[in-house]
């Protein structure tokens, strides 16, 4: 967290960072409103990975766990390492307060944004990206959007998720 936010949360550096992030997102949202863009702007709030390993110290000291109930940390194949918030606001397109159980990936931004701007993706562009507009619109699929999701954050660690199951290091666990 930057200096003006140090000590604001009484929950250490991470708590201060959360307060600063909230303030900065608020500034962006206020600017969109002030300039008349809020009703025609897609806003995505997400993260790139789960908690860092020093999060265990934070858990002990402040009784907070940013990965919630999920096992694992950044650069890990377990859910806590890569399951992150994915909050999308798009007035008139996405129903406020809606929630989806669909497994999505940030690589899906490419196909989604291409669809929004009517950009025809070539055969070699965004080959593993899916258009999320139906998910945003609250449509339910008869089968999952993607057959499986591969997670790897280091050369020798891979996980393969399909539905509620994850194959990790040749061990199958139910999540």
Predicted regions and their residues:
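C-terminal cap/loop subdomain of S1 sulfatases and analogous C-terminal strand-loop tails that border
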Residues: 51-77, 93-98, 102, 107-173
């Amino acid at each position: 967290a930057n200096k003006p936010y140090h000590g604001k949360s009484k929950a250490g550096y991470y708590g201060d960072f959360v307060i600063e992030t909230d303030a900065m997102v608020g500034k962006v949202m206020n600017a969109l409103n002030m300039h008349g863009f809020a009703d025609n702007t897609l806003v995505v709030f997400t993260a790139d990975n789960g908690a860092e390993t020093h999060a265990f110290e934070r858990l002990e000291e402040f009784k907070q766990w940013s990965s919630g109930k999920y096992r694992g940390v950044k650069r890990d194949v377990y859910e806590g390492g890569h399951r992150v918030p994915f909050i999308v606001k798009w007035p008139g397109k996405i129903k406020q307060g809606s929630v989806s159980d669909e497994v999505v990936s940030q690589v899906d931004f490419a196909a989604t944004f291409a669809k929004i701007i009517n950009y025809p993706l070539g055969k070699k562009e965004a080959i593993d990206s899916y258009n999320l507009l139906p998910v945003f619109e609250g449509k339910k699929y008869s089968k999952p959007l993607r057959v499986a999701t591969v997670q790897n954050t280091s050369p020798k660690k891979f996980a393969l998720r399909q539905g509620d199951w994850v194959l990790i290091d040749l061990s199958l666990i139910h999540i």
